[in-house]
Amino acid sequence: MTIVHPAQPVNGLNPEDVFYAVDDLGTQAGYGFILYQYQPGLYPDCPVNLYFSLDGDPSARYLLFGALVARARILQAANPALRTRLYTSISPADIQLKDFYLQNGFDCDETDNILQLTIPFGDGRIPMSCTVAPTPLHTWDEQQGLLYRLKVNEITFVDLDYLQSLMRMPHFMTLGLYRNAMLIGEVIMAGQGSDCELVAIYIEPGSRNQGMGKALLHRMMAIMAAEGVTRITTRIMSRSIPQQRLMNDFGATVLGVNMIFPGMYLS
């Protein structure tokens, strides 16, 4: 069994970040990749997060895992002053993989949690010099503009297909927060019937830690409540302090765990 890299980039990943496990007959027995993420807004205490995926026969697992960890240490060494975490994702029901990572020095403390928010009374107070308005998404350019703003604010899971599927739901709105006519944040909600999901929310870095996210989310929840929504859920990363703080502001309760993120700090 040996590890090889592709000759060309794969799905936007550099060849050196993609790994194939090949047996003595030349048959592929496993596949893995590693993705560098700089996320100071989501994880102020650990801005560099290296996500890896590993899939294949049990016989190839240790070899691929070792190669991925070695690559992670090379990536971490490029910016040794920045705290770095290496992590992956598994189902909460996958006890075998969980044990594998625990035995190899990972913790399984971080989870993708499903939460229900308490809908507050009233419309909420918008800060002085600020206004809110729906984000227009009628054209392809407007939709791409939203996706770009989400991406630069570390929200990468919303792509065009997903956004357009949300837009077709009975309850849908993207609400922007403006300070002195400048866009400083947006929130997306979508749902049907009495249920709605907080899909994403961001505040520009220069306006964070000033109550802007709380004010924007409060107003959006009031709008959805006026449409008949009585239940609002969302998903957060349990390790993200900013996400936890915002959820605490709305008395959120954990309904369940969607995913476990085994990981280890490299620095």
Language model features with spans:
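Short amphipathic alpha-helix that is part of the acyltransferase structural core
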Residues: 1-15, 125-157
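Conserved hydrophobic beta-strand within the GNAT/NAT acetyltransferase core sheet
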Residues: 86-89, 198, 232-236
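Conserved acetyl-CoA-binding loop-helix of GNAT-fold acetyltransferases
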Residues: 58-73, 203, 209-226, 245, ...
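Conserved active-site tyrosine of GNAT-family acetyltransferases
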Residues: 97-101, 243-248, 252
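A short, internal acetyl-CoA/4′-phosphopantetheine-binding micro-motif in the GNAT/acyltransferase core
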Residues: 22-24, 47-62, 91, 201-209
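A structural microfeature
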Residues: 29-30, 110, 183-185, 256
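Acyl-donor-binding surface of acyltransferase catalytic domains
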Residues: 55-130, 258-266
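A conserved beta-strand-loop-helix scaffold within acyl/acetyltransferase catalytic domains
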Residues: 8-11, 32-41, 155-204
